[in-house]
Each structure stands twice: as C-alpha cells, then as structure tokens.
Amino acid sequence: AASDVYKRQGHFYWDIYELYRHIVEGLKLAARKEDVEITSIGIDTWGVDFVCVGKDGGFLRQPYAYRDPHTMGAPDAFFTRVPRSHVYGWTGIQVMNFNSLFQLDTLRRNHDSALTAADKILFMPDALSYMLTGEMVTEYTIASTAQLVNANTRKLEDALLNELGLTQAHFGRFVYPGDRVGVLTKEVQRMTGLGDIPVIAVAGHDTA
C-alpha cells in the first residue's frame, strides 16, 4: 500500500481510489474461485488517517498520509489549550504528532477547506467500507487510534471535539467488531460478480 502514497505540493496523500480499485480487483478474483464461498467481507487498515466527506457524499480531498510533516509540533500547540494530562486521562493513547486529534487540529488551524466543508469524517477502513456499501460508520478500534475516544465511556469525547469545532454528528454511527455495516452496493455487485454480500465491521485497526 505504500505505493499508493504520493507527494504533491509538499504534502503526502493516500490515493484512496486506487486502494478501492485494488479491493474491487481482489473481490473479482475471489468471486471467480469455485472452491471459495464468500460469506462476508471485513476491512482493516493502519490507524489515524481519515477522509472528509461532503454533504453530497463525495470525498472532498484525498486523505493526508500520517507521514506528512504538517503535524510537526501539533501536540504542543494543542496542549496550550487543553492540558496533556486531560487528553491522556480521557483517551489513554500515547501522544504522537500524527494522531487524528492533532491532524484535525492542524487542519482547523490552517483553515483547511476540506475540513471546513466536511459533513462527515471517516477513518480509512470506514471510508473503504462506505465505498463498498454506501453506509457511513465509525468502527470503535480504528476510532480509538484517533485520540478522540474516551476510554471509559467508549464514545467520542465531546471536550476534544468542541476544541476541534466538531460534533458527534461529524462521525458515522459507532459500530463494534462483528456488527453489520451493510451489503455491497448494486454497482460493486456488478463490478465483482458477487451478490449482496454483507460487509462486517472488524477490528479496523491493523494492530488492534
């Protein structure tokens, strides 16, 4: 997947459409195998990266890759407003400059047009399952990598969202591993030769 990172104007992005194409091609190959019966599909990826989705359901920009340098120093900037101890107490997540919390705060401080226009924010596995099903969800384990989830309530922490200018409504419904996300869209069924196979939420973070 590293080959699907590209650099443009000094920033690193994922080509999410190319990742989706790989998934569709893989499903096509699997559908042709007579000795394989596909009963469900699950997607996991690396953590922290996300896609901004517009009101029309389209992606507003290719997602930044966590290797992008724009978050250098971002934690220190955030901790001038919210104490580090509070953030760690809520989330229990190791502070790293590329965590979604700091990516989002960097975009907010830079008046990023995609974030400003975002109706929904989808983490990478949820963005890919959305492309397969048309359903927008937020899977718990992938959300936990964002440093936005309260480890006690298992919900997004409002105090952090408020600091980012976001609300719970900016995220898809919460799902947990084993929950049903939806079924393949008619378009994906036509492209792959598969039927209405369910997409099931798995532990979406690859090291969960």
Language model regions located:
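Hinge/lid segment of periplasmic solute-binding proteins
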Residues: 72-83
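N-terminal glycine/serine-rich phosphate-binding loop of ATP-dependent small-molecule kinases
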Residues: 1-61, 77, 89, 162, ...
